[in-house]
Structure formats: structure tokens, C-alpha cells
């Protein structure tokens, strides 16, 4: 069950001295989880009672095993305000307990930074008791036509696909997030990707904070660290 799986995983972490400060039930679950059983849609009530029950089971395990950890519910449509709002409204209507709204934000899929800023403004108004975190973000510093990246042209109109372009994106994102007091965390997706990354996922994604070709830290690392220096 979701409860047993979650509780066992957390007990294992605690036993080994790694009790988390944050927990998250599900990953990018705008459209539910454990398909088809709990497949959902933010615009349709179908299966939401099932999803809510599964989330409540996971939440109960988190609260019991790690009572001091704050709990995130993580979705991946930050570029679509209606979908984001509907999702968290349905959580509210089904009385799902959590602390933090977690969002994935990738500019190549979720529109530009001003659009994300508007979503954050609206979340702060409609869900004032919830903190917000960007729990996944990244952008390219290189493009090797890998299986995840689609085409280079698809993303090059946002920022240059280069270390400078990645650094510009990171700086603009951090500068914007600092203006939103409800945002309390920023996490880079797969920052540790390096020259051995192909062994992990089968290809290079080239969105980490180490250059796959040189093994050196990319320029965006400094911009990313600027967020933490203002939010300790």
C-alpha cells in the first residue's frame, strides 16, 4: 500500500540517520499517480476520490514517521494557471493535508519567467496558508540532440543554448523568486550530471551544473547559489 511503502522508506532513512526535513507524496502528479487506478485531470472530478485517499495514506505515513518534516504536493504545470489552480483547489475540497505547493518549472515547457511570476502571485492569493517551492528547474548549456531534448530550435528562442544562456536564465529566475516571499525553496533537477551521466540515464541531458564535456562547474552555479545566500 501507499502507506506501507512510504512509512517503510522513511523508517529506513531515520534508522540510518537521514531523517528528511521535507517529504513529498508523489512526483509531478498533476494527472494523478499509480495509473490507471488514480489517473486524474485537474479539470475533471473523475477518480479524485481515489487519488485523495492515496495521498492521505502517504501523508499519514509522513506525519507519523517524520512528524517534524514539512510535506510537499508536487505538480508540473506551472505554465498553466487554470490547471494549477484547479489541482490545488481539488486538494482543498478533498481535505488533503500538506504544507507546501511544489512546482516544476522548465522554461522550454512552462512558458517564460513573467508567466511563472503571475502564477506565484495567484497562488499566494488563493492559497495564502501554503508556502511555495520550485522543486525542479533546469535549462540547457549544450545540446547534443539527445532523446530528452527534442530539437535545438525548439528552445533557442528562450535563451541561448550555452553556458551564458543557462546562466542568464538562472539569474533571471532567482531575481524573480526573491520578489515572492511565499517562495521558500528552489531546487535544480539533476545538478550533479557530469561526464559520466550517460551511465545513469543512457544519454546526456546537458542541463546540470557541471559541463559534461569538461567536468567543470558551469557559470549558472554561482547564480543558483545566489538564491540560497538570500534565503538561509
Which stretches of residues belong to each language-model region?
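Active-site neighborhood of glycoside hydrolase catalytic domains
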Residues: 4-8, 40-100, 118-130
Amino acid at each position: 500500500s501507499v502507506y506501507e511503502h512510504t512509512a517503510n522508506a522513511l523508517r529506513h532513512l531515520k534508522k540510518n540517520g537521514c531523517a528528511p526535513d521535507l517529504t513529498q507524496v508523489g512526483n509531478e502528479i498533476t494527472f494523478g499517480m499509480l495509473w490507471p487506478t488514480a489517473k486524474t485531470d485537474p479539470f475533471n472530478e473523475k477518480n479524485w476520490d481515489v487519488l485523495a485517499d492515496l495521498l492521505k495514506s502517504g501523508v499519514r505515513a509522513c506525519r507519523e514517521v517524520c512528524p517534524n518534516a514539512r510535506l510537499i504536493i508536487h505538480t508540473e504545470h506551472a505554465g498553466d494557471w487554470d490547471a494549477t489552480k484547479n489541482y490545488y483547489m481539488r486538494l482543498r475540497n478533498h481535505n488533503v493535508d500538506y504544507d507546501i505547493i511544489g512546482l516544476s518549472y522548465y522554461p522550454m515547457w512552462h512558458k517564460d519567467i513573467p508567466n511563472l511570476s503571475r502564477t506565484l502571485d495567484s497562488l499566494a492569493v488563493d492559497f495564502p496558508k501554503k508556502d511555495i517551492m520550485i522543486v525542479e528547474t533546469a535549462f540547457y548549456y549544450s545540446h547534443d540532440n539527445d532523446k530528452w531534448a527534442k530539437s535545438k530550435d525548439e528552445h533557442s528562442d528562450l535563451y541561448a543554448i550555452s553556458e551564458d544562456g543557462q546562466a542568464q536564465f538562472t539569474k533571471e529566475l532567482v531575481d524573480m523568486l526573491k520578489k515572492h516571499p511565499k517562495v521558500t525553496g528552489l531546487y535544480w533537477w539533476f545538478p550533479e550530471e557530469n561526464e559520466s551521466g550517460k551511465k545513469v540515464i543512457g544519454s546526456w541531458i546537458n542541463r546540470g551544473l557541471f559541463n559534461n564535456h569538461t567536468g567543470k562547474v558551469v557559470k549558472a552555479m554561482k547564480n543558483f547559489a545566489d538564491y540560497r545566500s538570500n534565503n538561509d
